[in-house]
Amino acid sequence: MRKWKKLGIGMAMVAVCIAGNGIYYGIENYKGQQFETTSTKNETGKQGSITQVTEQTATEVVTSERNTTEDAMAKVLEERRKNPLLLLVNKDHALPADYEVSLATLNDGHQVAEVIYDDLMDMLSAAKEAGYSVIVASAYRTRQRQEQLLQQEIRKNRWNGMTQEEAEADALLTVAPYGYSEHETGYVVDLVASNNQMLDDTQETTGANIWLRRNCQRYGFILRYPKGKEDITGYSYESWHFRYVGKAAAKEMTEEHVTLEEYLNE
């Protein structure tokens, strides 16, 4: 018969199990218990005793477990960061100067990275079968095009009465400067409902957008700038901005409710 004794060590607890003459240790989070010693009987009825576990020994066990976990996570992050589909491009991470991408052209003339083409087509077809008509509003952009969009947004803000500094700061909440836009990777598509092609807050109320947000991970996409994560992504919530990361990563990120920055620990 096994009996367990829990020994508190700050925020960690060592569980000691006696099986016959053997002693086993387990670790779990705990608070408030003090070290104890005890005695018990094994299956033969023979009296036995547990030597008191010292705080140093228990701490070493906890530290070993923590180091093992940290090492394993470091390896996972290293592999994730090597994955080209998980390339992080944001306000703090520029697109590599030597970045190149093979493009595929959609029927409407937009271009996307070849690697995402099939899954994108499958997602749009599935949306159509579900009764929703989805339009690609934007996809791959050259650096020149990205800069044009930023300047247009700044001019619009100036027209609306903002100072130059205010206009630039406001524009950067929604439009990235060239070299720092995910659209330059070819992995991004802005998708809108055919009956509402506005890139604003009304988009998330459309049936098409609701379907996309619920199902995009099945096809390797994530909602890149989710609501409530603005301080992490650096951008305002965009219900139409979908980023391809591959099916496995999309599934994990959706289940864990994390952004690409969090997934890569960047």
Regions found by a protein language model. Name each.
Residues 2-266:
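Extracytoplasmic cell-surface/polysaccharide-interacting catalytic and binding patches
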